[in-house]
UniProtKB/Swiss-Prot annotation:
Keywords: Cytoplasm, Exonuclease, Hydrolase, Nuclease
NCBIfam families: xseA (TIGR00237)
HAMAP family: Exonuc_7_L (MF_00378)
Main location: cytoplasm
Keyword tRNA processing: no
Cellular component terms (Gene Ontology): cytoplasm; exodeoxyribonuclease VII complex
Gene Ontology biological process terms, A to Z: DNA catabolic process
Catalytic activity field: Exonucleolytic cleavage in either 5'- to 3'- or 3'- to 5'-direction to yield nucleoside 5'-phosphates
PANTHER family (alphabetical): EXODEOXYRIBONUCLEASE 7 LARGE SUBUNIT
Gene: xseA
InterPro entries (UniProt xref): Exonuc_VII_L, Exonuc_VII_lsu_C, OB-fold_nuc-bd_dom
The name this protein goes by in its record: Exodeoxyribonuclease 7 large subunit
Keyword set includes Hydrolase: yes
Enzyme class name: hydrolase
């Protein structure tokens, strides 16, 4: 008997004995394919099975399934003869309550909310011009590279960036994140970003850890939670001082661009000039009214005295304006010096090389001979072969 013959016999056997059965479990992974077909894994406490629901069947389902949904399926078991891989083909689907992940998330969220960990009274304000910024994430992640690239594009060279490497997925991730958070919180930073790119509900579930949530709450450093995408919510989002929908959005929230700072200074100068002109116009009008009043009352001496007072006031205003302008010039010089000091760091970053294999960032120790990789810098990329 050949392999093909065996697979065909097993396929016929499975499909004849396991048809029109009810299967229940929790979605642990799902792909909504562009073709309209749905491919997902269904699990219980001990096992999982690959499932598919083709377009013709899922058009009748009144919702889009997601990781964490607890479902009841009707369908049959089938085997793909070419690979010998069997799966459950669903013909109908309905929700059967919450899955384990969703239930754990909601229970912890409710309990921490009752304890007051999400109360706005405890939220710390973010700094307007941060000078020491920490980022907790995987040092090899694409999210980190995107964040550093965006900082460089903004030309915000006032801040020094501290990177704290941590696991952002898996059972060991909460402990790793807590250790990194404690280390960062002891460094007197202006603000701290906890970041991770997108992923499945299971991939992001380490950010629903209770111990991590309590560590974030008691930290003295303002914390931004930037986990996943816009639609992803985790416990760290609620307990942090600010929630950013993505890692890049955290950078946009925290950092002004060089152009923004220049425009802000120009606006301040314009407002000072307007204020000065307004006050001078008021004093001129007052002087004119006083002159008219005392002229009719034949009090030239009093008019002269008021004129002198007006001149004194004008001198005081000139002095105040000059001091304010000097202060703005000193502040601008300070910002410019800080910009020049940190500009060198970002010029060096242009020489950094990122190695990607199969579209993912690769570690040098994982590469083998004849591997095809993509070498990327800030300005170009090349394909290379490992010798």
């Amino acid at each position: 008997m050949t392999v093909s013959e065996l697979n065909l016999k097993v396929k016929a056997l499975l499909e004849s004995y396991f048809e029109n059965i009810i299967l229940s479990g929790e979605i642990s992974k799902i792909t909504l394919h562009g073709s309209g077909h749905w491919y997902f894994d269904l699990k219980d406490e001990k096992s999982s099975i690959s499932c598919a629901m083709f377009k013709g069947a899922n058009l009748k389902v009144g919702f889009k399934p997601a990781v964490g949904d607890f479902l009841e399926l009707c369908g049959s078991v089938s085997l793909y003869a070419e690979s010998g891989r069997y799966q459950f083909i669903a013909t109908s689907m309905k929700k059967a309550g919450f899955g384990d992940l969703e239930a754990q998330f909601l229970a912890l969220k409710e309990r921490l909310q009752k304890e007051g960990l999400f109360d706005p009274r405890f939220k710390k304000s973010l700094p307007k011009f941060p000078k020491k910024v920490g980022i907790i994430t995987s040092k090899t992640s694409a999210a980190l590279q995107d964040m550093l690239k965006l900082i460089h594009q903004k030309e915000y060279f006032l801040a020094k960036i501290y990177i704290f490497d941590a696991l952002t997925q898996g059972n060991n991730a909460p402990f790793s994140l807590i250790q990194a958070l404690r280390k960062a919180d002891d460094m007197d930073l202006d603000v701290l970003i906890i970041a991770r790119g997108g992923g499945s509900r299971e991939d992001l579930f380490c950010f629903n850890d209770e111990n991590l949530a309590r560590e974030i709450f008691k930290a003295k450093t303002p914390i931004i939670s930037a986990i996943g995408h816009e639609i992803d919510y985790v416990i760290s989002d609620f307990v942090s001082d600010f929630r950013a929908p993505t890692p890049s959005a955290a950078i946009d929230t925290l950092f002004y661009s060089k152009l923004d700072i220049e425009q802000s200074l120009d606006l301040m100068e314009e407002k000072l000039i307007q204020l000065w002109n307004h006050k001078m116009q008021n004093y001129e009008n007052l002087l004119l009214n006083l002159s008219k009043f005392f002229k009719f009352n034949s009090l030239p001496k009093i008019i002269d005295e008021k004129i002198k007072q007006s001149h004194n006031i004008e001198k005081q205003l000139n002095h105040l304006l000059a001091n304010q302008m000097r202060y703005n010039e000193l502040k601008l010089d300070k910002l410019q010096n800080a910009y020049l000091q940190h500009e060198n760091f970002f010029n060096k970053s242009k020489k950094f090389i990122c190695i990607r294999k199969n579209g993912k960032i690769a570690n040098l120790e994982d590469l083998k001979s004849d591997d095809i990789v993509i070498l990327s810098s800030q300005i170009s990329q090349k394909e290379a072969k490992i010798l």
